[in-house]
Amino acid sequence: MAVPKKRVSKSKRDMRKTTWKNKASKEAKKALSLAKSVSTGKSKSKGFQIKSSN
C-alpha cells in the first residue's frame, strides 16, 4: 500500500533552495564575465576568438 512521504522541514527546504540559487548565481556571473571579455576582445579562450574581416 502506498504511504505518503514525510514532510521536509522549512529550514531544510530553504537550505536546498539557497544552495541551488547560489550555484545558479555563480554560473551566471561566469557567463557574464566571459561575454564581457569576448566583446572587448580580451578573451584567452580558443573557442571564443573574434576574427577580424580585413
From Swiss-Prot:
Task: Cite the entry's keywords alphabetically.
Answer: Chloroplast, Plastid, Ribonucleoprotein, Ribosomal protein
Biased composition, class Basic residues, residue ranges: 1-20
Tell me the segments the record calls region Disordered.
1-54
Q: Which InterPro entries match?
A: Ribosomal_bL32, Ribosomal_bL32_plant/cyanobact, Ribosomal_zn-bd
Q: What cellular-component terms does GO give this entry?
A: chloroplast; large ribosomal subunit
Gene Ontology biological-process annotations: translation
Q: Name one Pfam family in it.
A: Ribosomal_L32p
Q: Which GO terms describe its molecular function?
A: structural constituent of ribosome
Where would you find this protein in the cell? Plastid, Chloroplast
Compositionally biased, Low complexity: which spans?
A: 31-42
Which family does the record claim for this protein? Belongs to the bacterial ribosomal protein bL32 family.
The record's HAMAP family line, in alphabetical order, gives: Ribosomal_bL32 (MF_00340)
Its name, as the record gives it, is Large ribosomal subunit protein bL32c
Q: Which organism is it from?
A: Chlorokybus atmophyticus (Soil alga)
